[in-house]
Amino acid sequence: PYWKVFEPEFHLSGYDPLTYLGVTDWDFVYNVVRHPLLAFIIWPLWLLNAGLSALFGVNCVQYVVAVPVMLASFYAYLFIYRINRDVIRLQQYDATLLSAFYFSFAYIMLSVLVPDHFTISMFLLMFTLYLSGLLIRFNREFTWYESALLFLITAGVTLSNGIKVFFSGLFVNGKSFFRPTY
């Protein structure tokens, strides 16, 4: 029933209102092969929306989804900035300029405005890049449990993100990435 509410009004090419549907009426609206944990990640949002809907008598899904998307985009920006400052060691002006330049790309601007999992993936991947950069800078390696936790969370949002976490582990750990202890 909710698909009929969101689908005629949601016109962004390449995006669909699946997050709105899942938060409004919790179900496995995402393909669980590609997004194994995403339905469970949005479950607390469904609980919050159900409580707010019962309290106010209207569907508050736009507000409930907007808060985590805004937080994820803000922290993705902060991680881009910190990568530029702490890992690449740029000056403050240059780091700010490059961070703003990254967010000026149309695809990034559109992704942080739509209610989809792209912003959450971007936040998690920027965190992975930042953490990997710091580990390389301080000549440390990923431990197996750090990689496993990072893989579980990022691959839970989108399975292809897990491959990127493994690549970061390969670049950080080098040859020791292939050891059985890792």
Where are the regions a protein language model picked out?
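Transmembrane signal-anchor helices characteristic of membrane glycosylation enzymes that use polyprenol
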Residues: 1-15, 19-26, 182
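Short acidic/glycine- and proline-prone juxtamembrane loop motifs at membrane-interface regions
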Residues: 113-118
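Loop-to-helix entry region of an early transmembrane alpha helix in multi-pass inner-membrane enzymes
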Residues: 52-75
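Specific aromatic-rich, kink-prone transmembrane helix
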Residues: 120-138
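Short hydrophobic/aromatic helix or loop-helix immediately within or flanking a transmembrane segment
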Residues: 27-59
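Non-catalytic, alpha-helical, charged scaffold/linker segments
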Residues: 176-182
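Transmembrane-helix signature of polytopic, membrane-embedded enzymes
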Residues: 78-104
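Membrane-interface alpha helices of multi-pass inner-membrane proteins
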Residues: 141-173
